[in-house]
Amino acid sequence: MTNSGTNTDIKKKSKFRLFFKNIFTKDTNEFLLSGNIRYILAFAIPVLIFIVLFIIKGIAPFGNRLYMPSDMYHQYTPFYSELWYKIRNGESLFYTWNNGLGSNFMAVYAYYLSSPTNWTIALFPHDIIPVVLDWLIVFKCAIASLTMTIYLSKHFNTKSSFTTVLAIFYALSGYLAAYKWNVMWLDCIAIAPLI
């Protein structure tokens, strides 16, 4: 029984690799005409929904408000600020002297900041870190929609646009609506469909 389970896993991994190989080797017109536009829509529609919400609520850059509830304001933003300084100044990620008598920054980095997307904050000025965090939420929700579309399409072997609709529901689910301010957990939601 373990051999058949192993063979099935190998076949699934091979299909997954072939899927990505085909996406990146086809020319753009063939990609769009083959029904794969649903992947683009899976990413773009949540972004557009967030943009509309940001406009309605006046959240930066469409207004002067920020989305900073609870721990995102009091805890996460200072962590991201410290990460920004460490990246920009080439400082060590192991220890920080910038809070109290100093502390183990590697533990903070491992739990809160280790997502590769978080390093993008170093591309922006320090004073807009809260705005960048708002847009990281948007990006991670869009990635969650995209990965769920990939999973549903491959698992059910379909090119139906309904997979995109379900994936958008996943990316804009009640859990994400309530807890999207926990930026570090959004990565788990984004990669869960690929596991």
Regions found by a protein language model. Name each.
Residues 49-148, 168-190:
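Membrane-interface coil-to-helix junctions
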Residues 1-59:
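Start-transfer (signal-anchor) and selected internal transmembrane alpha helices
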Residues 40-44, 135, 164-168:
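Hydrophobic alpha-helical transmembrane segments
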Residues 32-40, 101-104, 130, 134-137, ...:
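Membrane-water interface of alpha-helical transmembrane segments
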Residues 195:
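Membrane-interface transmembrane helices that cradle and orient dolichyl/undecaprenyl
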Residues 149-171:
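Transmembrane-helix signature of polytopic, membrane-embedded enzymes
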